Curated annotation (Swiss-Prot):
Coiled-coil features, chain-numbered ranges: none
Family: Belongs to the WD repeat G protein beta family.
WD repeat start and end residues: 61-100, 103-142, 151-192, 194-236, 237-276, 278-320, 323-352
Protein name: Guanine nucleotide-binding protein subunit beta-5
Alphabetical keyword list: Membrane, Repeat, Transducer, WD repeat
Top-level taxon in the UniProt lineage: Eukaryota
Subcellular location: Membrane
Gene: GNB5
């Protein structure tokens, strides 16, 4: 028995070293293709002009830290979730609250709007993803119509509907992502590969979007094929947890924001990191990132209460937006690109334009 154990250990060690040497060879091959940096290519591109954006609306109503938010496809409504256990649907034009749900747990870390605008999904420390249909009958009890869709073995960190109301993608502290059928609550596909908590995910922007990207506490960003459940690309250049990932509008690249105080851009076709957005003066982590509709700007919320706006091509900072009185936890550009909304630990959401 002892010799068997020894053989197993030797085999494992040799497999590990083989994997490491293959990794090294892959890195060498990747390095050969690195002929030019993005900012060098962008030198001939005209610089951006004067950039002015300010808070147009402040949404107040949460009794604790705002943890997540999402826009409705109608470009007007916003859903937000908070540490107070409440999920609120807002009209961003009038700042009125249209719906409010009290969850059975605090720390509602994830919320999402269904593509049809007729339902919302949310979850957090209850390890579940719950879907609530939205109706405008004021007497109807939303909680009674709740559907428990996803069950993880640890907290729910992110959720997103696919291109229909019928399927939902979740990320969890149990180190997995999963695809669920909303109607039956059945698990359709699970995605294993992260070595620690998965903190964020984003769906590829195409209509046939069969891939998504996830990031987590193992400092890895992974691109997944939803049909096979396999990881098709992985990027490991961050030095700390990845808090946010977001696809470039074309779907050919994605950005990430991390506790290492940098945001990074990864090109999927070049299979490598092509830009780092950082400054020596930025020492706090980036909690949330999103692109402008054109893809030229990257908005990033930080733990030092600011929002930095980066020129994606040139890698330079175009603007800093002040207003929040605590760390910015979530940030999303509206579907028509005319505004973006940020949520913060100061209990408020702000709409900027």
């Amino acid at each position: 028995m002892a010799t068997e154990g020894l053989h197993e250990n030797e085999t494992l060690a040799s497999l590990k070293s083989e994997a490491e040497s293959l990794k090294g060879k892959l890195e060498e091959e990747r390095a050969k293709l690195r002929d030019v940096e993005l900012h060098q290519v962008a030198e001939r591109v005209e610089a951006l002009g004067q950039f002015v954006m300010k808070t147009r609306r402040t949404l107040k109503g949460h009794g604790n830290k705002v943890l997540c938010m999402d826009w409705c496809k109608d470009k007007r409504r916003i859903v937000s979730s908070s540490q107070d256990g409440k999920v609120i649907v807002w009209d961003s034009f009038t700042t009125n609250k249209e719906h409010a749900v009290t969850m059975p747990c605090t720390w509602v870390m994830a919320c999402a709007y269904a593509p049809s605008g007729c339902a919302i999904a949310c979850g957090g420390l209850d390890n579940k993803c719950s879907v609530y249909p939205l109706t405008f009958d004021k007497n109807e009890n939303m909680a009674a119509k709740k559907k428990s869709v996803a069950m993880h073995t640890n907290y729910l960190s992110a959720c997103s509907f696919t291109n229909s109301d019928m399927q939902i993608l979740t990320a969890s502290g149990d180190g997995t992502c999963a695809l669920w059928d909303v109607e039956s609550g059945q698990l359709l596909q699970s995605f294993h590969g992260h070595g620690a908590d998965v903190l964020c995910l984003d769906l590829a922007p195409s209509e046939t979007g069969n891939t998504f990207v996830s990031g987590g506490c193992d400092k890895k960003a992974m691109v997944w094929d939803m049909r096979s459940g396999q990881c098709v690309q992985a990027f490991e250049t961050h030095e700390s947890d990845i808090n946010s990932v977001r696809y470039y509008p074309s779907g050919d690249a994605f950005a990430s924001g991390s506790d290492d105080a940098t945001c990074r851009l990864y090109d999927l076709r070049a299979d490598r990191e092509v830009a780092i957005y950082s400054k020596e003066s930025i020492i706090f982590g980036a909690s949330s990132v999103d692109f402008s509709l054109s893809g030229r700007l990257l908005f990033a919320g930080y733990n030092d209460y600011t929002i930095n706006v980066w020129d994606v091509l040139k890698g330079s900072r175009v603007s800093i937006l002040f207003g929040h009185e605590n760390r910015v936890s979530t940030l999303r550009v509206s579907p028509d690109g005319t505004a973006f909304c940020s949520g913060s630990w100061d209990h408020t959401l702000r709409v900027w334009a």
